[in-house]
Amino acid sequence: MPACRLGLLVASLLLGLLLGLPPVTGTGAEKSGVCPAVEVDMNCTQECLSDADCADNLKCCKAGCVTICQMPNEKEGSCPQVDIAFPQLGLCLDQCQVDSQCPGQLKCCRNGCGKVSCVTPVF
């Protein structure tokens, strides 16, 4: 087989492989909220890979061997009372908009200078 036909054959095979691969799901911004508690009676199916796969405000949640789009919960606890006479020290900037933007169990709460920060909740 001539070299030009062999090159064309290899190029065609590579193109066929690339077209046969599934599209890569975007890693869109994470949606607000916290996934609800795991329900016991679920089949092992994958409805989503990331929040971008879910409609509206639904969040892609892992529940055992399942990933499903669910309405998220807020994080537990409530925001601590802010003493206006003694506002928090530090930068007076918005650090978050919703609880899910805060690490761990921290909540997004008013910080005393008209902005919001990730703070330890009151239980």
From Swiss-Prot:
Gene Ontology cellular component list: extracellular space
UniProt-listed Pfam families: WAP
Disulfide bond positions: 35-61, 44-65, 48-60, 54-69, 79-109, 92-113, 96-108, 102-118
Domain of life according to the entry: Eukaryota
Swiss-Prot/TrEMBL keywords: Aspartic protease inhibitor, Disulfide bond, Protease inhibitor, Repeat, Secreted, Serine protease inhibitor, Signal, Thiol protease inhibitor
Presence of the UniProt keyword Secreted in the record: yes
UniProt-listed GO biological process terms: antibacterial humoral response; innate immune response
Stored CDD domains: WAP
Gene Ontology terms for molecular function: aspartic-type endopeptidase inhibitor activity; cysteine-type endopeptidase inhibitor activity; serine-type endopeptidase inhibitor activity
InterPro entries reported for this sequence: Elafin-like_sf, WAP_dom, WAP_four-disulfide_core
Tissue-by-tissue expression: Detected in the distal parts of the epididymis.
UniProt signal peptide: 1-26
Residue ranges occupied by any WAP domain in the UniProt entry: 28-69, 72-122
Subcellular compartments: Secreted
PANTHER family, per the entry: WAP FOUR-DISULFIDE CORE DOMAIN PROTEIN 2 (PTHR19441:SF34), WHEY ACDIC PROTEIN WAP (PTHR19441)
Role description: Broad range protease inhibitor.
Subunit structure: Homotrimer; disulfide-linked.
The protein's name: WAP four-disulfide core domain protein 2
Species whose genome carries this gene: Sus scrofa (Pig)
